[in-house]
């Protein structure tokens, strides 16, 4: 019988640099186009120990224990696919907040799948096969197997690496402690869309997203990418950059992309404090700010380190969790 060595695994999180809901499938799942970007902090810690049978998740939080944890789902899905996962106990210490749109649980699942796949030495499944298993565990799980910037389509499981270079920028991630239910956010979007109160049109049409990502490295400030907008009847326009800035930039943030999130309209209408946090990031000098996923976390992109640190201090003084990343 295979055994897993005792070890501690650290799993991070992600943000969505843009997210547009493009439709609803007959089975109720939502199609989208999004750009995942991995972050190393906040993070969860998983202490892995060998066990006699099955998989057990322990935590100081009772709601994380038991078979409903996504870690258990990953273990059982791996076994059902023909793998031979070693018995293990996982002691989980959460650092990634729940209901924040950061994918902490998905990152846990991906880390466990990678561990299981190499438990016997040589990988049991190919990268492609493991990604298919990951998609059965959760829509965001395949991304964390890559853990590099990726364009995602479908329900988030169809991934293409994105040549995105944000080096030199400072990212301020704000985690307000508000939990936003992803099913609630989708249902709210459906209600507003079907009532005509919220048009599903985003600023980055799905059909142009792959081409936009392909040009991230080659598009300069004097050569903006042109693309149709997502709403019928609009004329062809020159795409704005990821930020609202116009100055010359040897490393444009993303002249081909729109910074957009379909969930902001519906989530901000119910959680007005999140809109205020976004405005605070912009007021402190962020070149751009956005909510990640279905919320509640938000991030701002800063050129200036001092401005990023000032924004961090603002939230720290109000006992709001905040993280600064130099990209």
UniProtKB/Swiss-Prot annotation:
Active-site residue list: 14, 140
Cross-referenced InterPro entries: GHMP_kinase_C_dom, GHMP_kinase_C_sf, GHMP_kinase_N_dom, IspE, Ribosomal_Su5_D2-typ_SF, Ribsml_uS5_D2-typ_fold_subgr
Pathway entry: Isoprenoid biosynthesis; isopentenyl diphosphate biosynthesis via DXP pathway; isopentenyl diphosphate from 1-deoxy-D-xylulose 5-phosphate: step 3/6
Xref: Pfam families: GHMP_kinases_C (PF08544), GHMP_kinases_N (PF00288)
E.C. designation(s): 2.7.1.148
Function: Catalyzes the phosphorylation of the position 2 hydroxy group of 4-diphosphocytidyl-2C-methyl-D-erythritol.
Protein name, per record: 4-diphosphocytidyl-2-C-methyl-D-erythritol kinase
Lineage of the species this protein comes from: Bacteria, Pseudomonadati, Thermodesulfobacteriota, Desulfovibrionia, Desulfovibrionales
